[in-house]
Amino acid sequence: MANILRTVIKIITCIALVICPMPEQKCEPEFDGTFLQSWMSAYWDDERWQEEIDVMKEAGIKYLIIQDVASKSTNGDWTVYYHSDLEVFEGADFSANDVVESALRNCDGSGIKVMIGLGLFDNWWNKSGFGDEYSELCDVCSDMIAEIHENYVKEYPDAFYGWYFTPEMSNGPLVKLSSPFIAKGINKVIDAIEKTDASAPLLLSPYFSQFGANPEIESAKIFWTSFLSRVDFRSQDIFCPQDAVGAGWVFEENLPNIWRMYSDAVKQSGKDIHLWANCENFTSPSFKSNTSGLTTPFPTENTEYVTATLDRFVRQMEIASHYAENIITFSYNHYYSPVYTDPMFHETYLDYLENGHVLESEAPTAPTALAFSTDSDGNTVLGWQASSDNIGVAYYRVCADGKFVARSEYWQENAVTIADAQSGTVYSIVAYDAAGNPSAAAEITF
């Protein structure tokens, strides 16, 4: 079903591009900013910060967006990632390190500017702007802006760039119906920014879902045009949609239509704001359920969160570059940093930059020594010797008579369990490197 829908969307997109070609590129197909979740950096010491900053600079990163530095759980408890004296945070769980201070101090003088994410509440996902909780959050965010500006930004003014409004809007029905309340809350936050450093931009990063109750792109354009017109945006503010490919809410084939929609919405809103792109460099796992393809994404081959190989990531950035002024990503630190993950992804990206946005094309060698065995539970196991590559192998893809069976990531064993193996079945294994180059297939018959 997913492949059929992809094909239909691809045909529609091709026709649309013939009628209305993509505009000329507005930026290079590369990212210069990244999101970093506060929980991840909460235990970084200065040495780790400097390691991350060094590799971010190698990758050309200029903007570091710290995600929510205060988060409210469904039971009302707060987790706060900076030293705050706000009454609302009394009794909160404070992180081991002050993320705001650490980010600003370590980035000071590095050439990387920090955007600070404000508050978030877990009930956003099932309430959106309805009820008192959202309005109260915006009040808290306004107080956070004043406090953080006074205690941190004034000390590190050259490292600070702006603010990130963390609740993630979408084209879902709850967001649409409560959008007047959401806009009112954002206006409150902008007022707070104006009272501190009026030149500081506010960044929003919503997403589009082609699943659920309102999957039509034209409907989304009407919504975003109306919503953007309601917010008191200033010329420095940034509308930076997630492309939602990594999370599975969008097919890659649909990206030209979606970015055209966002571009049109900004133009038709009458707001003089910046359109950036948040291109996702990961793939979320999604499992088969009764809602797959209806309200939730289709199942994925990967069963864990994985780094997207650079071929897909580059295609995302190339499309976005025709509509967006600038590209950032979620998340270099989580999925591409050699300090946190395998260096092959960082090295492949650097090679891409150094070679003028051309992907390296050397394929891995084919897996060898394929063999079947039986584990202690009596399951059939297919194992193999690892492939080699000039930079690194990201994963292996296993098929049975041409149909997908399993995927093995670079950190996993070179073996997969075969359910209900049948005599005469031909199993094939293909290795993929960090650029997405496939090896020749290695085969074995059961």
Specify the residue positions occupied by each region the protein language model found.
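Active-site groove signature of glycoside hydrolases
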Residues: 119-121, 145-178
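Pro/Thr/Ser/Gly-rich low-complexity, intrinsically disordered linker/stalk tracts
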Residues: 355-391, 436-446
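Aromatic-lined carbohydrate-recognition surfaces of secreted/lumenal glycan-active proteins
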Residues: 115-125, 161-168, 186-221, 239-245, ...
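Aromatic-lined substrate-binding rim segments of carbohydrate-active enzymes
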Residues: 49-58, 62-123, 179-202, 254-257
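An active-site-proximal structural segment forming one wall of the substrate-binding cleft
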Residues: 95-110, 131-162, 220-232, 320
